[in-house]
Amino acid sequence: MEARFTRGKSALLERALARPRTEVSLSAFALLFSELVQHCQSRVFTVAELQARLAALGRQVGARVLDALVAREKGARRETKVLGALLFVKGAVWKALFGKEADKLEQANDDARTFYIIEREPLINTYISVPKENSTLNCASFTAGIVEAVLTHSGFPAKVTAHWHKGTTLMIKFEEAVIARDRALEGR
């Protein structure tokens, strides 16, 4: 009886707690997310309501993603600048969620409060087929909710929306107080 417990070390027991494998089957993710969209769609009447509901669910996920990333990161420091927070989202958060960095991060030419994260082929929209009457639907509103929660819980309150432009573009509009704080930090 003792032999079955001492036969060898299990690969599961040898894994580090700080960095668990977070791979999820793409087909399982696609099925789960499409069911989530169908569930939300059955409870709303307009595309705007559906996108708002997906964003709300994304905000719940975003708060948990931030907690998990901060808990796993050794020696991590808290970002104090807007650009650092955006690079954290573009890099670490995107890698944790989708296995790669976002394609592009840009700032609007005419507004210091507005930034864009561009994803040419978002994984979240890959397996969702949208009927013609709902052609404006962008399921990346879920991702926008995640990004909004990560930024807001990190101390950078912002409103994030998803748009169709060069693939999917997440438009991040920070509150004026965030930009004022960033400028004050630059002046030091």
From Swiss-Prot:
Keywords: Endoplasmic reticulum, ER-Golgi transport, Golgi apparatus, Phosphoprotein, Transport
GO BP term (any one): endoplasmic reticulum to Golgi vesicle-mediated transport
Modified residues (Phosphoserine): S10
Subcellular location: Golgi apparatus, cis-Golgi network; Endoplasmic reticulum
Keyword Nuclease: no
GO cellular component, one term: TRAPPII protein complex
Family stated for the protein in its record: Belongs to the TRAPP small subunits family. BET3 subfamily.
Assembly notes: Component of the multisubunit TRAPP (transport protein particle) complex, which includes at least TRAPPC2, TRAPPC2L, TRAPPC3, TRAPPC3L, TRAPPC4, TRAPPC5, TRAPPC8, TRAPPC9, TRAPPC10, TRAPPC11 and TRAPPC12.
Functional note: May play a role in vesicular transport from endoplasmic reticulum to Golgi.
Protein known as: Trafficking protein particle complex subunit 5
The organism of origin for this protein: Bos taurus (Bovine)
